[in-house]
Amino acid sequence: MRVLGVDPGLTRCGLAIVDELSGKKVKLETVMVFRTDSEEHVSQRLMKLDDAINQVIKKFKPDVVAVEQVFSQHNLKSVMGTAQAAGVAYINGAKANCEVVSYTPTQVKASV
């Protein structure tokens, strides 16, 4: 099974491709950080993130898209951008007929 892990963010969005090998062994295929310019309008930033995630899905063909859940922060603007980026990942996964799941940051750290 191949998983695209997404640590959503509007300024920096972490993407990783992980392959499940036999048993509980996994192989990190690639990791990348996609950045957008905070000077650009949010619609342009989301469109660029959409294009980037779409290209990663086309290139690596994951079975599952795992999105880290947005947790409550004090900065509402930051939470909104993170939630919007997560939504882009959800939509791209669904369009590619991938299983889309979400995990808390604690669950992600415990599994690595």
Regions found by a protein language model. Give the residues of each.
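Phosphate- and other anionic-substrate recognition elements at nucleic-acid/protein interfaces
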Residues: 1-112
